[in-house]
Structure formats: C-alpha cells, structure tokens
C-alpha cells in the first residue's frame, strides 16, 4: 500500500488561484466518503503519478490529510490532454471490509495460434466489472489466448479466477475471438477490375432526352 501526502486547501479559491496551483505542479483534489467529511486538498502531481503506477487504478492509498491518514481510492480524475496535465482528483475514503464494484482491465497474454496462421485477434471486451473488498481487487485480469485457433473465442465464463473476487459480467459475454483472415484480391484480379472499369463507356447525361426531343420535332 502506497502513501501520499496532501495539503488542505483553505477558503474558496478562484479560477486564477487554481490555475496558479496547477502551474506550480500541484493538483486540486477533494476527499469524501466513509468516516470523513468533504475536504478540499492539493497533492503533488508527480508524486500522485508515481503512486498510481505503483498501486494501479483501483489501488488503495494511505492519504495524509492534516494530522490523519485516510485509506482512499481514486474515484475519478480529470486530465487535460492539451497541457498533458491532471487537473482534478476525487479521492473516495473507503471501508476496507466493505465490497466495492469497479472496472478492471483485461490483459491478453500470449500469441494466439490462429494469429500465427493469419487470423485476426479481436477483443470486444476491454474491462470487466469486479466486486471485492479493496485489498482483493486485482490490478488487471489476465486472459491466456496462446491456444486459440482461428474461429475460437473465450467468454467471461472461461476465465480462471485466481483471487477473492467476483466477476459481475454476463458469463456468455465474449472477451476475445480469433477471426479468419480477410481474403485480399490478387494483383491479377485488381488489374482485371481496373481494366473492366476503364472499358465501360460513361453514360452521357441528357443523351436520351435529346433523342426524344429530335423525334418530337420530326413528328
């Protein structure tokens, strides 16, 4: 479990104050949830990133708030891609004995046999809904695809659970499948198609109409 220090933000801050705060390398944040009142804090952005890399997106953090240490998870955060900067964080204070349902990333492991034969690995499901107490939430769920042939697939029910957690998704939901390769036309077929399109006479717009008008004049 990683630790992170925070500093309580006093009073109401203007947009200019928050901009100055972010420019100094700090991120405005709020702490709320189990056993605590809503508290506005700020944390060091670099230190926060280090902690998340250590514990993962759903990891538990010992957050120092004033004279207390609160066990929290990151409930939400906002990121500015233009400035490459985290702009706000929501820390949720948690009860370690209470189960929570969160999204956990699926990580494919190995290279499918079917992919080596030209098949294409498709992954329709990238995250799974997992219920567990905070310390039992996995960082990722690994799915071994090394034995998959072309037209093989794996569903949620095929996952071998190696921890104290429950997957909430429909057991029949497909996680990964190996589809047959798409047949691409050969060079000869491409040249033949191009030749056919070149020999087709373009339709002259209005030609039929002019012929009808000439026939009417003769009548």
Curated annotation (Swiss-Prot):
It holds the Pfam family Ribosomal_TL5_C. Signal peptide: none annotated. GO terms for biological process: translation. Residues 176-219 are annotated as: Disordered. GO terms for molecular function: 5S rRNA binding; structural constituent of ribosome. GO terms for cellular component: cytosolic large ribosomal subunit. Residues 184-219 have a biased composition (Acidic residues). SUPFAM superfamilies: Ribosomal protein L25-like. CDD domains: Ribosomal_L25_TL5_CTC. Keywords: Ribonucleoprotein, Ribosomal protein, RNA-binding, rRNA-binding. NCBIfam families: bL25_bact_ctc, PRK05618.2-4, PRK05618.2-5. Belongs to the bacterial ribosomal protein bL25 family. CTC subfamily. This is one of the proteins that binds to the 5S RNA in the ribosome where it forms part of the central protuberance. Part of the 50S ribosomal subunit; part of the 5S rRNA/L5/L18/L25 subcomplex. Contacts the 5S rRNA. Binds to the 5S rRNA independently of L5 and L18. PANTHER family: RIBOSOMAL PROTEIN L25/GLN-TRNA SYNTHETASE, ANTI-CODON-BINDING DOMAIN-CONTAINING PROTEIN (PTHR33284), RIBOSOMAL PROTEIN L25_GLN-TRNA SYNTHETASE, ANTI-CODON-BINDING DOMAIN-CONTAINING PROTEIN (PTHR33284:SF1). This is Large ribosomal subunit protein bL25.
């Amino acid at each position: 479990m990683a630790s992170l220090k925070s500093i309580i933000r006093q009073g109401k801050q203007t947009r200019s104050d928050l901009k100055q705060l972010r420019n100094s390398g700090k991120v405005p944040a709020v702490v709320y949830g189990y056993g605590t009142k809503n508290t506005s804090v700020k944390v060091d952005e670099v230190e926060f990133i280090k902690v998340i890399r250590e514990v993962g997106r759903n990891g538990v953090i010992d957050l120092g708030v004033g004279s207390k240490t609160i066990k929290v998870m990151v409930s939400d955060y906002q990121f500015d891609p233009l400035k490459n900067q985290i702009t706000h964080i929501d820390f949720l204070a948690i009860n370690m004995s209470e189960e929570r349902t969160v999204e956990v990333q699926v990580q494919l492991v190995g290279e499918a046999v079917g992919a080596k034969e030209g098949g294409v690995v498709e992954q329709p499901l990238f995250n799974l809904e997992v219920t567990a107490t905070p310390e039992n939430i996995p960082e990722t769920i690994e799915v071994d695809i090394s034995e998959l042939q072309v037209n093989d697939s794996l569903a949620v029910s095929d996952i071998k659970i190696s921890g104290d957690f429950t997957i909430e998704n429909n057991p029949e939901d497909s996680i990964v499948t190996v589809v047959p390769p798409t047949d691409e036309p050969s060079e000869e077929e491409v040249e033949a198609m191009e030749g056919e399109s070149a020999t087709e006479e373009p339709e002259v717009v209005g030609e039929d109409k002019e012929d009808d008008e000439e026939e009417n004049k003769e009548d």
